[in-house]
Amino acid sequence: MVCRIGVVVLATALIYLCSVLLPPTAVATFDEVLDTTSDLVSGVGAKNWQYDMGIKKFVNSYTSYQFPNPFPPNQDPLSRLEFPIDQWFLGGEYDYIERNWSLEFQSWMNLNEESRTMMQDSDWDNENQPFQKTVFSESKCRLNSGWLFDLKLVLKPEWSIFRTLLPIGGLRYQSFSFTTHDGSQVGLDGHSIDLPGDGINFDQTFYHGYLGMEVNTKLNTSGVFRSVPSMDFKVSVDYGLATARNEDLHLLRSGRRITNENTSGHCWHAEATASFYARRNIKGLLSADFKRIITDGGHQLTNSVFNIDFSFDGARVWSDQLSITAATEFIF
């Protein structure tokens, strides 16, 4: 069901291209469909509300963590793990708009699980050569569940300076649950071994509150595209404090070996959106979004079977996230 919805949303986004590329008779039919949809939207919903529905694709994105050796020679890092994020997400945005402010809420969930990029695990465990990577492994990786939430307040003061430059603030929550599987490992001597089956269960959450600015402008395109009479452009930049929590269960290690990281730091975020008006209450949206999260803090290692439980500082958690989103917006 979810996959079918995703296909429908993608098809809706492609319609905008078709309106430009198709012959006049096909464009006329497309306009009739838009008119009917616009009439339906006008008869439902509540005043001051907008709803977007779309798909998001992550590109060249990952989330990583590393920790040092707490004992001499204190190599840093001792171990580093990098998990890819390149899945498709389905979601939407609910907006409530007043004259001087608006409240926006986004929610997204992953559509597919398997990543096309390999997870990487590296170790520097030779005490005589602390800067020499000694073990490297790659594994297939699936995202069992991924959730993204964003609650944003946009202020629209009537002062002249804020007519196009709007203050924003909000809260974000991200949750990722990965499982690595069917990997291979190679040592410094060139000897390699296969790692069949599941290898690591890794759960991660990010929380960040942020403040920033948003710039909006409008462009009249009625003389170019009949079905796209105008376009809105929006660019937002924000900065916030972030916290991260990790839990890593190594399934191939003896006992029940779990590492935890509790870290804090910051997040930079930038987004650019183009909105294509098809009718007064129907828009197509295309946006690009980038986040960089960097946090530092404590690392804990436990293994209940061997009665191991100790903690130390120096862990680092970071994530680069680039995504492209296509959506349809209905204005009530």
Language model features: what each stretch is:
Residues N60-Q87, M109-L148, Q174-H208, D238-E271, ...:
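Extracellular/periplasm-exposed beta-strand and loop segments of Gram-negative cell-envelope proteins
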Residues N144-K152, F162-L166:
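A structural/positional concept
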Residues Y51-V59, F105-L111, L155, P167-S175, ...:
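Transmembrane beta-barrel strands of outer-membrane/channel proteins
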Residues M1-N48:
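Cleavable N-terminal export/targeting peptides
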Residues T29-T117:
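N-terminal entry module detector
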Residues L90-Y96, F149-P157, G169-Y173, L211-T217, ...:
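Residues on the lipid-exposed face of transmembrane beta-strands in outer-membrane beta-barrel proteins
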